[in-house]
Amino acid sequence: MGLRDAQRVVPALRVASYAASKAFYESLGFREEWTHHVEPGLPTFASMMLDGMEIFLSEHSGDCQPGGLVHFYVPDVDALYDDFLAYGVNVEQAPNNDLGADLRVMSVLDPDNNRLKFLTQTHWE
C-alpha cells in the first residue's frame, strides 16, 4: 500500500487550553471522539469530529504552533453560516466569493487564533 492509496489526512492544531477549545469546537458542531494523556495531569491530545471531518487538538508544545489554518469543504457554507450564527459563533468573515465566483468561503478564529475556513465549491469542472 502506497501513499496513493491513502484516503485520510487529519490536521492537528495547537491549543493552550483543551477545555476552552473543546467548548469552542462544540459550539461549531464538533464532538469529542477521544482524548489521550500520557499520564494524568499531562497535556491533552484529542480528536474532534464534525460530519466525518476530523481534527486533532493538542496542548503539547512540541506538536505544532498556534496560528494554524485548516480548510473544510462543506456542502453548503451559507447554511453552515446560519447555523453558526444560531449557535452564537463569532464568524470572522461571512460567506463570500473573494476566492472566485465558483467558491464560497467563510472563516472563523478559534481561541488560539487558528483559522478555520469553510468552503463550498459551487461549480465543478
Predicted regions mapped to residue ranges:
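Conserved acetyl-CoA-binding loop of GNAT-fold acetyltransferases
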Residues: E26-E33, V89-N90
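Conserved short beta-strand elements that form part of the metal-binding/catalytic scaffold
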Residues: E32-G67, R115-T120
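Conserved catalytic-core motifs of GNAT/GCN5-like acyltransferases
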Residues: A12-R14, R31-E39, N96-D98, Q121-E125
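Residue-level marker for the onset of beta-strands and adjacent loop->beta junctions
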Residues: V9, L42-T44, G68, D102-R104
